[in-house]
Amino acid sequence: MSDLKKRFEKAVADSKNLPEKPDNQTLLKIYALYKQASAGDVDGKRPGFTDMVGRAKWDAWNGLKGTSADDAMQDYIDLIESLK
């Protein structure tokens, strides 16, 4: 396992124990970076207006389309570190 992957997995664990709950925009960014790092570009249709949470998550993830997994992992690590 690469050093980046190990640091990413540690950041994922650390994200569950942050001193304060991040605001919704930051939570969406955390979600999107995690999904981009672990699954790649978003796939499937954008959720409809009745699923506001799903739609916001999809939009955040879609905003990272084309970002490499390594870049998304590093951005995720940096974001979690800044929230500690």
Per-segment meaning from a language model:
Residues 1-84:
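A charge-rich, low-complexity, intrinsically flexible signal that marks solvent-exposed coils, linkers
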